[in-house]
Amino acid sequence: MLGSTHGTFTTDLRARVVACGEQPDRTVVHGVAAVEGDTDVSGRPLHAPVPDLDRFFRPEVVAVVGASDTEGRPNTGITRQLLDWAGRVGARVVPVHPTRTAVFGIPCVPSVAGLDGSVDLAVLLVADPLPVIEELAASKVRFAVAFASGFAETGEAGARAQERLAAAVARSGLRLLGPNTNLNAFERFREDLEGPAVALITQSGHQGRPVFTLQELGVRLSHWAPTGNEADLETADFISYFAHRPEVGAIACYVEGLKDGRSFLLAADQAARNRVPVVAVKVGRTEAGARTAASHTGKLTGADRVVDAAMRQFGVIRVDGLDQLQDTAALLARARPPVADGVVVYSISGGTGAHFSDLATAAGLSLPTLSEAKQDELHQWIPDYLSVANPVDNGGHPVGDWRGRKIIDAILDDPAVGVLICPITGPFPPMSDRLAQDLVDAAERTDKLICVVWGSPVGTEEAYRTTLLGSSRVATFRTFGNCIGAVKAYLDHHRFTTGYRSPFDEAPRTPSPSLRKARALMRPGHRLSEHAAKQLLRAYGIRVPREQLVTSAAAAVRAAGLVGYPVVMKASGPRLAHKTELGLVKVGLTSASQIRDAYRELTDIARYEGIDLDGVLVCQMVGRGVEMVVGVTHDALFGPTVTVGLGGVLVEVLNDAAVRVPPFGEHEARAMLGELRGRALLDGVRGAPPADVDALVEVVLRVQRMALELDGDLAELDINPLMVLPRGQGAVALDALAVCREGAAS
């Protein structure tokens, strides 16, 4: 707990840490006992069971409802693909058709009622899956897939139809994929590829196709879950399941909208505990993208700033393009944990090395200068006039003979080096073929990551197609940008998971004594006055200035004597949001006459503007510091969110803020400050003393507790400015705005 005497609860969200290098057991949620009904103080779940989807992906018996072998009908092509897939996974197919005796020579049953209870998976090739779902429940079928469209993606009527379908599924006890999905779960997965696999989750089948083609580049794929509208099974279910599969090295997701924010975070938490990378394209960065995504699946896209922060908070690697999704997931799936974060660029061309180094440094990668001893060693094989400090320029000729392997081994032998990147911008077989083979051979002998960027636009060269893509130990890229992004994600994810502490482990489960005081202040559907909002802050141990609310000039003079000169006077009322712009704040008042004049002027302005006041605040003047803003808003997907940023009258102009989704701990609160462009102001600039960052962090954590406990009551909170005083002097909320939700619990 941070050292404060304010408040009645701890802000410490300690969690158990997996020892560095320890490999979590993927058969259970690592470190978590899933407890039925275990919720945080806001009523949201803290644990989610891992769904058992083994019989979905590897069923023994598959029923195809609406199977057909009549040429020209859509169901015929689907039935044919299902038969092919079933043959490869060893499943028996039972066609269901009311009038046919056989389909493709396989005996039919006339209805779902005729199934014998051994069916694991039912594929529904029918326009309306609802009546079939109800029949499947009686036959004890465990899983179903509904391809039909016309549900939430079509508007209100479709959304109501999907609600009825979801309710029927919930009653039945089976699990449903879809509706509005496709055949991607039943694709042909190659069994001849080595190494850990990429598991794929998409809400659009076409968008997953580029990642599926990783198999043509030598990368193994294990599963594809096309979730569609997610009436039942959702993206989070598949993340949880894949995070516990031993063959899965990384999870690649294409997400248009999320069904439930908390379930997504719980799934991402399980992946982080098990150190399984999750890489995601999340549509909706722009208004047009969000609108299109919502209409495609009928799900909320969420405020993009919040989605971005939530993903980063739980280690989900967000990328923008499908090519980035493909390359990043492939690298993360197959790379061993880094032994160091130093990156060396090794190239045939000095220009290529310089260009790549600029891009890598700009991305935040560490390119250490090799030691003098290491440079002397490299100059045994590389001419002295070439630079080998990093990047290492070999000039071309050494790679064509025995020296090439010596150079690579010497670089990898440096303990500061964890990644070697070799950009080969164009094929020149006497050099590039030998270089590619030397890199592949070196990758088999080292635990360090070796990456190659093959720059030829042709892509049919033997060194590329056979040598590089034939190796599961070398990460091969086609562009500089994708290589740099993937390597950064690789190093960042390792750092994240090595120090990961799940915030769910120590999230508050029971209300603090502050809640009773706070609820007494709530006014459902109304904005609180500044005075009432500050009382709310005081209930949670957040320091506010000494102040009194008065309704006469004489009372204001008496209050100033009690508060202590100099004072600030402010109009107070529930409809006041921007007092400064209206001239409703007077500062630096030092005498009774100034107090009386200020009172008269404030009330006159309010009367002229038609603003109802509950009085005038006479407030203690607080010393100078760094003005910050700390606030709470409610996101449709994730619930309460906490924001911290640079504050004051220019808060909207500066737009320098970081956001998090509760629960989070002290480490995450400090990370929020590190994201601010103006972070240096807290360290002291131009002679100003360093600010009390510890006090600021504690305010953020106390506001988070308030946001969780008052989730059903508080729609919005804005502390602006929060004056962060010099180190050791604390932080004071000089102004506050609070808006109560309609139908609040109070």
Set out the residue ranges of the language-model regions.
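Catalytic-core regions of core metabolic enzymes
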Residues: 17-20, 27-746
